[in-house]
């Protein structure tokens, strides 16, 4: 699912107007700030003047890993003036790219099969997207780590005051380990639970989601709306209940509560144009449509 979301965001950031995204209600869950994600996209082209090591630093900042032993999605490898890259969004197509340098200039870009090494074709340009949806700048990361550290101290002290030493110990060990991973690798398992710090959001402020990546004039189509709309309404409450337990028992900081799906009101504010498709529309759809209803007769399969 993560790879599909990466590919979707890459398509939306391409600027094309003919993109169709098919998604479940999970599209309302938190993602990175679109501006921060776009800032980590590296555009390269044949004839581009750039130092090889500078390009490799761009890849590392986008969470690519230098791996000569196991060349897989999200990795790159270096052999002299040649850099092989396996973009994260190409996982399903199985296409990797070879970037050849002549001094400090990109001389050639080609795609190839990472299993056989067979060249597929030449490329004039290439966009390299991050391997992770939660990206941020080094400055923002340093600030976020400081804020996480402060909140950890407050929450540990709170647990000790109310007589929960085991919860305090569990939380301390978990968050300290996560911070070490973030400092070393730039990310950790469950980093989305710290997204509020990396996005610079205040407590309670809505997270960014897939809908923020769409242009302002996008059209939303909700299929089986009599079922989907109630699901959207219930998502926030269900997620909140589960996360509250994680916080109370010391598995997560309170900031994890802000890694959440949108409330129904927030969802409505992001979807100015919508078509509700249903054989049995509820009162909500009928009221929202203000009487603008189109009937469609669908032939039952096998009867005619």
What are these regions (language model features)?
Residues 1-304:
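ASCE RecA-like P-loop NTPase motor cores
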